[in-house]
Amino acid sequence: MNICRLKPEFIEPLALALFEEWHDFAPWSSLDKIRAYYAQCLDGDDLPLAFAAVDKEGRLMGSAALKRFDMACFPEHEYWLGDVFVLPQFRGLGVGRQLVSFCLDKARELGLPHLFLYTPDVQAVYEKFG
């Protein structure tokens, strides 16, 4: 597996998978919103930055992002780890763990002082990362 910046060709399969699974949540309730968000992630070196896990055949396995001011209800939290998603056929292989580790390393490289993550149902999964 390789982790790299999200590429344009991954936006559509990622958007479809995210919409299928997360469409009940406001940011993911529209395919057009999802596509626009990931297109923004391709634009330069500023946050948001999205990363893709890719298998040796070049297939998208999952993604994660570094973001700024991700949630309006937490305006005091500037830097976020978000959108951690692994396509169903690649779950259980450690892809999510590697994406999170990659993002934490990238955040350190960028000099981000800390990251926040909001996930009401699986917070304990991420707590072991610190």
Residue ranges and their predicted role:
Residues 1-14:
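A short beta-loop-alpha structural element at the N-terminal edge
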Residues 15-29:
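Helix-loop element at the rim of GNAT/NAT acetyltransferase active sites that forms part
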Residues 41-46:
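Short loop/turn motifs at secondary-structure junctions and domain boundaries
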Residues 50-52, 59-69, 80, 85:
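Conserved beta-strand in the GNAT
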Residues 84, 115-118:
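Conserved hydrophobic beta-strand within the GNAT/NAT acetyltransferase core sheet
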Residues 90, 94-102:
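Conserved acetyl-CoA pyrophosphate-binding loop and the N-cap/start of the following alpha-helix
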Residues 109, 113, 120-130:
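Conserved active-site alpha-helix within GNAT-family acetyltransferase domains
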